[in-house]
């Protein structure tokens, strides 16, 4: 198997978890418009 694909998948799922947690936190969301979509 390709270790790079596994690492990329792990990183993507970590980012999803970060985004979910961060974007529900207004101060974090404001500081990370690139992952939270900005707009507010």
From Swiss-Prot:
Domain of life: Eukaryota
Compartments where located: Secreted
Transmembrane regions: none
Annotated spans, Ser-Xaa-Pro motif, crucial for potent interaction with nAChR: 24-26
One term of GO molecular function: toxin activity
Tissues showing expression: Expressed by the venom duct.
Disulfide bonds listed in the record: 22-28, 23-36
One GO location term (cellular component): extracellular region
Proregion positions: 1-19, 37-40
Residue list for modification Cysteine amide: 36
InterPro entries the record matches: Conotoxin_a-typ
Family of the protein in this entry: Belongs to the conotoxin A superfamily.
Function: Alpha-conotoxins act on postsynaptic membranes, they bind to the nicotinic acetylcholine receptors (nAChR) and thus inhibit them.
Record note on domains: The cysteine framework is I (CC-C-C). Alpha4/7 pattern.
Record-given protein name: Alpha-conotoxin-like Qc1.4a
Source species of the chain: Conus quercinus
């Amino acid at each position: 198997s390709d270790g790079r694909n596994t690492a990329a998948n792990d990183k993507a799922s970590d980012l999803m978890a970060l985004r979910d947690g961060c974007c529900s936190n207004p101060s974090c969301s404001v500081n990370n418009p690139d992952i939270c979509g900005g707009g507010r």
